């Protein structure tokens, strides 16, 4: 339980933190154990996409870097909740960890939106908008997204985020009831950081589904795979981000008393914990469903087997060379694995597409 001062002078709220302190460690440990290795692999596969001149890799790498930044802040938050919401580090570290926690949401939303728009342009308008589907354009968009969130972060650095409760606990990034300056930034976050991107994302995936249904060169099984991927992407996106933003808006509009803050505290913090699972869902949805990723995993597995066997027998390099026919042959035999939204159907390719130029080679479905 903590007695948290909202503005250090006028009002304090005593709120039971028991549920938050019970659930948060479980979520943080799960995201650390699963999310860190998954995002490291995702970063590697994003690099391979960039190496193949696929602009999708730029968005994947930026999305993964944002997730890794947040994951690296989790040990601090884990210590915080295990110490009964008592921040034992400096004020600046609280601000940095808080920024990594909250801004990761909007950086992730931004890059997920970019990926959806990029896939829509590739599928629905394969012969147009080439200038928007280049590495240079992707880097430019990425710079804008990071700059927007860094500028927003400066706003938080101007305010004190570590306050002391009646038990001399130093609480971090918690103000109850919500402060006036927070309302303005929350409205901005809801409208620009969530509502606009989700409208773009939903419109993009609706356009992808429409284009796939109209495609006569795509097998029904592959159409079903794409539809399942799109549906799961939207459902996971909404599950991770919608509850938090609904409650963020509710708090910003109506929270003016301690009683209201107490009433929404558990639901608000539960919804905030849900956003953490996006760090696990991102690499699964956007990397591990790709056929090229299956192929790269086979090659990576072959390399690891080569290293381990070599250390024992000294002959593994001949048995399991990186990219050996055994590994690539397996991928070839599984040519029906879904490339889904990371590749273009041959019917959509132009003479400029790689293996001839500007689009990724392969199939959409």
Swiss-Prot record:
It is linked to Amelogenesis imperfecta, hypomaturation type, 2A6: A defect of enamel formation. The disorder involves both primary and secondary dentitions. The teeth have a shiny agar jelly appearance and the enamel is softer than normal. Brown pigment is present in middle layers of enamel. Changing residue 175 to F: No effect on pH-sensing activity. Changing residue 89 to F: No effect on pH-sensing activity. Changing residue 245 to F: Decreased but not abolished proton-induced G-protein coupled receptor signaling. Severe loss pH-sensing activity. It is found in: Cell membrane. It is a multi-pass membrane protein. GO terms for molecular function: G protein-coupled receptor activity. A multitude of proton-sensing residues, which include extracellular histidine residues (His-17, His-20, His-84, His-169 and His-269) or triad of buried acidic residues (Asp-67, Glu-149 and Asp-282), contribute to activation of the G-protein coupled receptor activity and pH sensitivity. Residues 161-176 are annotated as: Extracellular loop 2 (ECL2). PANTHER family: LYSOPHOSPHATIDIC ACID RECEPTOR 5/SPHINGOSYLPHOSPHORYLCHOLINE RECEPTOR, OVARIAN CANCER G-PROTEIN COUPLED RECEPTOR 1. This is G-protein coupled receptor 68. The lineage of its organism: Eukaryota, Metazoa, Chordata, Craniata, Vertebrata. Glycans are attached at residues 3, 8. Residues 345-365 are annotated as: Disordered. Signal peptide: none annotated. GO terms for biological process: cellular response to pH; G protein-coupled receptor signaling pathway; inflammatory response; insulin secretion; monocyte differentiation; negative regulation of monocyte differentiation; osteoclast development; positive regulation of insulin secretion involved in cellular response to glucose stimulus. Keywords: Amelogenesis imperfecta, Cell membrane, Disease variant, Disulfide bond, G-protein coupled receptor, Glycoprotein, Membrane, Receptor, Transducer, Transmembrane, Transmembrane helix, Tumor suppressor. GO terms for cellular component: plasma membrane. Changing residue 84 to F: Decreased but not abolished proton-induced G-protein coupled receptor signaling. Failed to stimulate IP formation at pH 6.8, activity is restored at more acid pH. Abolished response to shear stress. The keyword Signal does not apply. Pfam families: 7tm_1. It comes from Homo sapiens (Human). The record marks 17, 20, 84, 169, 269 as: Proton sensing. Residues 50-53, 126-133, 215-218, 290-365 are cytoplasmic. Changing residue 169 to F: Decreased but not abolished proton-induced G-protein coupled receptor signaling. Failed to stimulate IP formation at pH 6.8, activity is restored at more acid pH. Abolished response to shear stress. Residues 1-12, 85-89, 161-176, 255-260 are extracellular.
């Amino acid at each position: 339980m903590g007695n948290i001062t909202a503005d250090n002078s006028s009002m304090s709220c005593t709120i039971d933190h028991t549920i938050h302190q019970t659930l948060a460690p479980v979520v943080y440990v799960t995201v650390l154990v699963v999310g860190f290795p998954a995002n490291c692999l995702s970063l590697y596969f994003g690099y391979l996409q960039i190496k193949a001149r696929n602009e999708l890799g730029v968005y994947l790498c930026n999305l993964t870097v944002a997730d890794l930044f947040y994951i690296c802040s989790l040990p601090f938050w884990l210590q915080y909740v295990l110490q009964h919401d008592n921040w034992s580090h400096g004020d600046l570290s609280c601000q940095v960890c808080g920024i990594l926690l909250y801004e990761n949401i909007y950086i992730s939303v931004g890059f997920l939106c970019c990926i959806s728009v990029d896939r829509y342009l590739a599928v629905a308008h394969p012969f147009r908008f080439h200038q928007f589907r280049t590495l240079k354009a992707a880097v430019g968009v990425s710079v804008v997204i990071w700059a927007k969130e860094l500028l927003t972060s400066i706003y938080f650095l101007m305010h004190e985020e570590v306050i002391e409760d009646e038990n001399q606990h130093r609480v971090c990034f918690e103000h109850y009831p919500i402060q006036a300056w927070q309302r303005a930034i929350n409205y901005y976050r809801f409208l620009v950081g969530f509502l606009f991107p989700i409208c773009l994302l939903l419109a993009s995936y609706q356009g992808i589904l429409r284009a796939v249904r109209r495609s006569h060169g795509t097998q029904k099984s592959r159409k079903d795979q794409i539809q399942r991927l799109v549906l799961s992407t939207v459902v996971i996106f909404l599950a991770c981000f919608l509850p938090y933003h609904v409650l963020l808006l509710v708090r910003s509009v109506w929270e003016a008393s301690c009683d209201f803050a107490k009433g929404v505290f558990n639901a608000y913090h539960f919804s905030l914990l849900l956003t953490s699972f996006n760090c696990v869902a991102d690499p699964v949805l956007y990397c591990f469903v790709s056929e090229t990723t299956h192929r790269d995993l086979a090659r990576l597995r072959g390399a690891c087997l080569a290293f381990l066997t070599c250390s024992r027998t000294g002959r593994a390099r001949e048995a399991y060379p990186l990219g050996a026919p055994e590994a690539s042959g397996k991928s070839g035999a599984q040519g029906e694995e879904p490339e889904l939204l990371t590749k273009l159907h041959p019917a959509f390719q132009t003479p400029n597409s790689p293996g001839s130029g500007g689009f990724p080679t392969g199939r959409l479905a």
